[in-house]
């Protein structure tokens, strides 16, 4: 039987937002339920994000988490969560100027 990854093992490389792939950074504003989140993205828009099944079972998401989001490209402002960043990864994103610190503080202050 295969063993799962331990809690402290490396998760691999941290994915970055890419204009070619269409991904962007977002912050979870509200957990709607049934595998959906309301996220505020760096472009200032609020989207409805779906958590894929493989993530839903393994990764818990809560308000204030920073996620990598892939919009579906339709007019109804929906998309899919690709990755959830850990606290140290969020600090790296802020240091690389990919994520405005004001956006993180704004959502954290609203809780």
Swiss-Prot record:
<feature type="domain" description="S1-like">
    <location>
        <begin position="12"/>
        <end position="86"/>
    </location>
</feature>
<protein>
    <recommendedName>
        <fullName>Translation initiation factor 1A</fullName>
    </recommendedName>
</protein>
<dbReference type="Pfam" id="PF01176">
    <property type="entry name" value="eIF-1a"/>
</dbReference>
<comment type="similarity">
    <text>Belongs to the eIF-1A family.</text>
</comment>
<keyword id="KW-0396">Initiation factor</keyword>
<dbReference type="GO" id="GO:0003743">
    <property type="term" value="F:translation initiation factor activity"/>
</dbReference>
<comment type="function">
    <text>Seems to be required for maximal rate of protein biosynthesis. Enhances ribosome dissociation into subunits and stabilizes the binding of the initiator Met-tRNA(I) to 40 S ribosomal subunits.</text>
</comment>
<dbReference type="InterPro" id="IPR018104">
    <property type="entry name" value="TIF_eIF-1A_CS"/>
</dbReference>
<dbReference type="InterPro" id="IPR001253">
    <property type="entry name" value="TIF_eIF-1A"/>
</dbReference>
<dbReference type="InterPro" id="IPR012340">
    <property type="entry name" value="NA-bd_OB-fold"/>
</dbReference>
<dbReference type="GO" id="GO:0003723">
    <property type="term" value="F:RNA binding"/>
</dbReference>
<dbReference type="InterPro" id="IPR006196">
    <property type="entry name" value="RNA-binding_domain_S1_IF1"/>
</dbReference>
<keyword id="KW-0648">Protein biosynthesis</keyword>
């Amino acid at each position: 039987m295969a063993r799962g990854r331990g809690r402290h093992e490396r998760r691999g490389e941290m994915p970055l937002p890419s204009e070619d792939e269409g991904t962007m950074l977002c912050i979870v504003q509200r957990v709607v339920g049934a595998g959906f989140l309301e996220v505020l993205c760096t472009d200032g828009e609020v989207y409805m994000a779906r958590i894929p099944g493989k993530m839903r079972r393994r990764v818990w998401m809560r308000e204030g988490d920073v996620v990598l989001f892939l919009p579906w490209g339709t007019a109804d402002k929906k998309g899919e969560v690709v990755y959830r960043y850990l606290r140290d990864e969020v600090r790296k994103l802020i240091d690389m100027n990919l994520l405005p610190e004001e956006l993180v503080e704004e959502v954290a202050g609203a809780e």
